[in-house]
Amino acid sequence: MSQLTEIVEQALAAIEGTEDLKALDELRVDYLGKKGKITDMMKMMGKLSPAEKPAFGQAVNQAKQAVQKQLSERIDNLKAKELEAQLVAESIDVSLPGRRIDNGGLHPVTRTIERIETFFGELGFSVKEGPEIEDDFHNFDALNISEHHPARADHDTFYFNPKVMLRTQTSGVQIRTMENEKPPLRIISPGRVYRNDYDQTHTPMFHQVEGLLVAENVNFAELKGILHDFLRNFFEEDLEVRFRPSYFPFTEPSAEVDVMGKNGKWLEVLGCGMVHPNVLRSVGIDPEKYSGFAFGMGVERLSMLRYGVNDLRSFFENDLRFLKQFK
């Protein structure tokens, strides 16, 4: 028994003096492992009389429990010290000023296009896209634009050759849709268009959204109602809107749409009209059976009016001071 007591005292003293978790595990193996010192004491059972065995066995088990308890407490203590040291080393000074997180934001032109798509999507219009390099049939001929119309001039259009050009409007998407799909049709076609112009209110590339509805018994009153609701929704105001007679080769009758600005002056925002019968014929649609209306708007112009931007070129200069205002 004295030998067992001595082994337990050695184990407890060694555990208490250990400052390393790895060393503690080695002590556990030395005393409690399969070949450990306390485990070896059980081998002495064979030398004891039957009367001595119960008391000795109980003493060995108590020794194991005492050493195991001391080991567990020491391990917990050392782990707590390690955590405390780690927290001190990794402490955060909450009094330091925060660092700004620069989140991205949508470009104002993208915001405007999404707003337009959302409104017309709720009315059942689908979004269609088409090529930006266009042929003269889809860009001019099918739209009832005559060979000598000013829009075909070199100073207005970027030509690759006399038959191929950068599109000047997204109307070509409408022509392609009418060629491939049968009425009734209800589409909008957002996209980039190109014209040879550059000043405070014009850029060589800009964005346009055009709309088309073709079905039976379509009339101008429907067009007025939809555009009136759109403008009020887009500007989030009960705007005064007027339709002013105008001329476009691809619509008849045609109109330009103005809204009353805060300065008391009328501002032009889009063009529209009933689809010209010649346009319907060019894509194989019978104008005696079907009619339709079309409209087109410059996205940058609408963005300028909505956000109070004075120079259209600001949208393309990538000035972060300007763009961060729209986050």
From Swiss-Prot:
Q: Does the keyword Nucleotide-binding apply?
A: yes
State the EC number(s).
6.1.1.20
Residues binding Mg(2+) are 252
The record's GO CC annotations read: cytoplasm
Known cofactor(s): Mg(2+)
Q: Which CDD domains match?
A: PheRS_alpha_core
**Where mainly found?**
cytoplasm
InterPro entries from the UniProt entry? aa-tRNA-synth_II, aa-tRNA-synth_II/BPL/LPL, Phe-tRNA-synth_IIc_asu, Phe-tRNA_ligase_II_N, Phe_tRNA_ligase_alpha1_bac, Phenylalanyl-tRNA_Synthase, tRNA-bd_arm
Q: Which Pfam families match?
A: Phe_tRNA-synt_N (PF02912), tRNA-synt_2d (PF01409)
Q: Which UniProt keywords apply?
A: Aminoacyl-tRNA synthetase, ATP-binding, Cytoplasm, Ligase, Magnesium, Metal-binding, Nucleotide-binding, Protein biosynthesis
Q: Which GO terms describe its molecular function?
A: ATP binding; magnesium ion binding; phenylalanine-tRNA ligase activity; tRNA binding
| UniProt xrefs under SUPFAM superfamilies | Class II aaRS and biotin synthetases, tRNA-binding arm
| Catalytic activity annotation | tRNA(Phe) + L-phenylalanine + ATP = L-phenylalanyl-tRNA(Phe) + AMP + diphosphate + H(+)
Top-rank lineage group of the source organism = Bacteria
**UniProt key word Ligase:** yes
Which Gene3D superfamilies is this protein grouped with? Bira Bifunctional Protein, Domain 2 (3.30.930.10)
* GO aspect biological process, one term: phenylalanyl-tRNA aminoacylation
Where it sits in the cell: the answer is: Cytoplasm
On subunit structure and binding partners, the annotation says: Tetramer of two alpha and two beta subunits.
- What family does this belong to? Belongs to the class-II aminoacyl-tRNA synthetase family. Phe-tRNA synthetase alpha subunit type 1 subfamily.
What is the name of the protein in this document? Phenylalanine--tRNA ligase alpha subunit
Record gene name? pheS
